[in-house]
Amino acid sequence: MPESPSTTAVAAELHVIADQADRLRERVGSLAEPFLGTDREDLVSAIHEAERQLRMAERSLQRALKTAR
């Protein structure tokens, strides 16, 4: 029978990944700033949608982290 992985190790990995998702969300969000108020609202909208998706991913990872602890 295979050994089950340590929840401590899983929690640590989830913490690192959630932190990375947060930093990526911030980076992605800042990409829209130069285009605010220009005729590139299509680009701003797409960037903001990507930022929202990263926020949702981070929240899901945080929930998984709480479950693993």
Predicted regions and their residues:
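N-terminal acidic leader/helix
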Residues: 1-31
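Short, charge-rich amphipathic interface segments used for partner binding and complex assembly
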Residues: 30-67
